[in-house]
Amino acid sequence: MKATFPLLTGLAAALLAGAPKAMADRDSDFWLPENMAKNECTSVHITYGPKEDTHTAAYQEVVVEKSAPGSYFACNNFTTGYIGVQQLVENYKDGTPVRVAIFSVWDAKDSGDNPHAAPESERAKLIQRGPKVMTDRFGGEGTGGKSMRVFDWKEGDVIRTLVVEKPDGEDFRQITGYIFDPETQKWELMSSWRVQALRRGLGGGCGFVEDFRRNGESRFHERRATFGPALRYVNGVWKPATEFTMTKDANPNMNINCRFNPARGYFSLATGGDIAENPDFRVFETHELPQQPAPVAVDPAVQKLVEAPLLPVKEQEPYTEPRWQELDMED
């Protein structure tokens, strides 16, 4: 059958995926740790260190080794947004999963979870979107602007992302997300947003693995990915992350781990299924890589994007229809 997908992320995507409606209320019992344990895999994160809050660009590589319906593999969760890839719950008629890329930027100020509550002057303003990219407002986990596109990544692929911040006068900044498309062999624009400059620098920086299906059954499926290299651009110099910290959410399930992946030379995160803890890398511990990774030569195309001039700001770029293109889905 033909189906259209609402352009949803976070809580809204989980509701579409069959999770209980109670999860839309952050004060509901759904979010009690004991109930989280029954409904979902534990969310696990890996922070890229040392801390470089003033960096103005961030390049990450992630390899997904194992996925499941309703999975989010964030390549970079910076202070005011995130970029990564997802496997949706639905499949195409031939049984292959629907997979997408996502880039979101939060509004500069906290306006709760209602995307319509933020004053227009405080909203992230869409400047430009890439081909095949859909854009809209989001809520439910703070508020801001989101962009998504069909992106047929595979297990074992090297997923490459880039986020760039540029000052836009004294009061604003532009934040732009790109993803490398292996089919075109080019960096492709996800979207660019203009936000109030309450801070400078992308800040933060971590990857995570999340089960957003949260329907009880999804916790029995393993999700695993390796994160790195991670480079931050500080004062004109690319600096690699050299230490990594594992964290988790409030879910008490401990079938999670972080361990060194010698094939990639970086740490992997895993959650769900029959995963067992790694006693050599426990939650909230920080570790350096056990062996020196190969030097990363920054793609000249990446440097060109980092050094590109500001985009012209006119009127708000109109959002796309908040639905996916028609896809040939299973009945």
Predicted regions: what they are:
Residues 1-8:
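Bacterial N-terminal signal peptides that target proteins for export
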Residues 9-15:
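Bacterial N-terminal signal peptides
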Residues 17-19:
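N-terminal signal peptide c-region/cleavage motif recognized by signal peptidases
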Residues 25-132, 305-307:
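Secretory/extracellular carbohydrate-interaction modules
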Residues 26-70, 205-209, 214-331:
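Activation corresponds to long, low-complexity, non-globular regions
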Residues 130-140:
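Short, basic/aromatic beta-hairpin or loop at an interaction surface
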Residues 138-158:
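Short, aromatic/His-centered strand-loop micro-motif at the edge of beta-sheets
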Residues 153-188:
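Carbohydrate-binding surfaces in secreted/extracellular proteins
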